[in-house]
Amino acid sequence: MAYNKKRFTSSRKLDHLRICAEEEVESGDAGFGDVRLVHHALPECDMRSIDLSTRFLGHTLSSPLFVSAMTGGHPGTKDANARLARIAERFGLGMGVGSQRAALENPALADTFSVVRDEAPHAFLVANLGAVQLREHGAAWAGQAIEMIGANAIAIHLNFLQEAIQPEGDLSATGCIAAIADLCAETKIPVIVKETGCGISREVARLCWSAGAAAIDIGGWGGTSWAAVESFRADRKDAQGRALKTLGEDFAGWGIPTVVSLAEVAGTGSPVIASGGIRSGIDMAKCLALGADLCGMALPLLKPALESDEALAARVETIHRELVASMFLCGAARIRDMRRARLFITGRTRQMMDDGNPA
């Protein structure tokens, strides 16, 4: 049978959604256990009046919780995207969609993405295109991705570990930073450069800022492992499939832990989205104290999004309660006050941060 690239890309998106929902795809330690916020025994603020609102790329959001890129590109993903969008609209959150490549290859799938603007007419929405696809198709594809969801910004994702271990992976990264720079110069909306689970170093952050990126989403190691996802996806019936499965398992530990990546990137510029293994409002508070502007969650929201609007809303409310309580106990009445919250960093995370900052 002839290889059908359009159908294959769409099928892969459904595979990813199913695997993330059904399998154990989290790997590693993002470093939050090594971060301890200093308790403020006299917080001098009213917990009931704590303000979670924040500004990001010229937009006011009701909370720093960002619904991270997850899905789209197959008819079976439309309902989840619609539910996530309704929650983003209801709670005043920013939201990113999954890679729009499938819908750009096959416009019949565009409604699996455009539904987010239908359901969230006022939300801050972020389009999504891979760096390789940007290099191959240029700003024209980026423009189509933006138009598809009426996006307020576009994320260019870096997923070269995933590409390296999937059978249909794009194996050349040559020219991607130049393509990002060209897009930043041409587009009228902000460009966000995002990793997808391996983190961003200070060196790469500086390349992104120099290229004109408006923000960086660190996508650190310690949350959903796309190496693990591809390992589950690999066909184990033949030698190549077994080899790819082993490769995915071997690289499950590859990457920069989220806390370390956040510290590195926040020291080079802003704004920064922290993501990768953030599982609670307490983790969010730690990220804000470390310099994050927004905190992205994907897997913790995907699972309730596959259940019901009520389950998803309950999860968001719990996260917000945890964040408010954490801020109160740090004496922070507003999000910007968390920048002044003291914290201790211990263990392996401290060691990695110290090793990355030689005297």
UniProtKB/Swiss-Prot annotation:
InterPro entries referenced in this protein's UniProt entry, alphabetically: Aldolase_TIM, FMN-dep_DH, IPdP_isomerase
Ligand binding (FMN): S68, A69, M70, T71, S99, N128, K194, T224, G277, I278, R279, A298, L299
Record's keyword terms, sorted: Cytoplasm, Flavoprotein, FMN, Isomerase, Isoprene biosynthesis, Magnesium, Metal-binding, NADP
UniProt-annotated location(s): Cytoplasm
A Pfam family of this chain: FMN_dh
A single GO BP: isoprenoid biosynthetic process
EC main group: isomerase
Annotated substrate binding sites: R12, K13, S99, Q100, R101, Q162
Binding site for Mg(2+): E163
GO molecular function terms noted in the UniProt entry: FMN binding; isopentenyl-diphosphate delta-isomerase activity; magnesium ion binding; NADPH binding; oxidoreductase activity
Stored CDD domains: IDI-2_FMN
Cofactor needs: FMN; NADPH; Mg(2+)
Reaction(s) this enzyme catalyzes, per UniProt: isopentenyl diphosphate = dimethylallyl diphosphate
Residue intervals passing through the bilayer: none
CC terms in the record's Gene Ontology section: cytoplasm
EC number: 5.3.3.2
Function: Involved in the biosynthesis of isoprenoids. Catalyzes the 1,3-allylic rearrangement of the homoallylic substrate isopentenyl (IPP) to its allylic isomer, dimethylallyl diphosphate (DMAPP).
Family assignment from sequence similarity: Belongs to the IPP isomerase type 2 family.
Complex formation: Homooctamer. Dimer of tetramers.
HAMAP family: Idi_2
Protein name: Isopentenyl-diphosphate delta-isomerase
Species of the source: Methanoregula boonei (strain DSM 21154 / JCM 14090 / 6A8)
